[in-house]
Amino acid sequence: MSQARFIAFSDGSALVNPGGPGGTGFVVLDRARPAYRFGGTRWVEDGPNAVTNNRMELRAVLEALEGLPGGEQVEVISDSRYVVDALSRWIHGWRKKGWRTASGEPVLNRDLIEALDARASALSVRYTWVRGHDGHAVNEVVDQLAQAAARGVAGPGEAEVVAALRAEAFLAGGPAAPRSSRA
């Protein structure tokens, strides 16, 4: 785990892949304060940008990065190898090749990848992959937030987010809970 000021956990879900509906979930921890925010969004899209798991994963990262102050270090933690590889490895070659893959095909989800690249350019972002459904408490919470958003139902609340952050030692236990906001 890096010493970044912000730790952003994200996950996406598509109930039907492709076609949706889909949902996003995120938790962002500001370790300098300490404070956190969390949320999720339901998405229904069709046409060339129809809901897919990968689009929801990318949207979740974009939502997590929104509003972070420029110049700050951020570690994005995702259980999506696609997100981590696309944003930390493949993007450099895609830009050089005019947004074409190694096989010459157009890059899928280019709109979201370019939006994330623009947002990340104002920050110092490191992408870290974790195995999903493998005991990472905060990753489980963002998964639940994404699935609940996709279904249009209430997801985990503040108590569950705090418990997950404490379980992974991102927050100290005790009576004084950090400030939060639900996006």
From Swiss-Prot:
Task: Report which superkingdom the organism of origin falls in.
Answer: Bacteria
Record text on subunit structure and interactions: Monomer.
Q: Which cofactor does it need?
A: Mg(2+)
Name the InterPro entries for this protein.
Answer: RNase_H, RNaseH-like_sf, RNaseH_domain, RNaseH_sf, RNaseHI
Q: Which reaction does it catalyse?
A: Endonucleolytic cleavage to 5'-phosphomonoester
Claim: RNA-binding is one of the keywords in the record? no
Any idea what this protein is called? Answer: Ribonuclease H
Molecular-function annotations in GO: magnesium ion binding; nucleic acid binding; RNA-DNA hybrid ribonuclease activity
Domain RNase H type-1 span(s) in chain numbering: 2-151
Return the similarity comment.
Answer: Belongs to the RNase H family.
Cofactor comment: Binds 1 Mg(2+) ion per subunit. May bind a second metal ion at a regulatory site, or after substrate binding.
Biological processes annotated in GO: DNA replication, removal of RNA primer
Q: Where in the cell is it found?
A: Cytoplasm
EC numbers on record: 3.1.26.4
Q: Which gene encodes it?
A: rnhA
**Binding site residues for Mg(2+) 2:** 11, 143
What the protein does? Answer: Endonuclease that specifically degrades the RNA of RNA-DNA hybrids.
Q: Which PANTHER family match?
A: RIBONUCLEASE H1
Keyword Nuclease part of the UniProt annotation = yes
Q: Which UniProt keywords apply?
A: Cytoplasm, Endonuclease, Hydrolase, Magnesium, Metal-binding, Nuclease
Provide the residue positions that the database annotates as binding Mg(2+) 1.
11, 57, 79
A Gene Ontology cellular-component term: cytoplasm
Please give the positions of the paired cysteines in each disulfide bond.
none
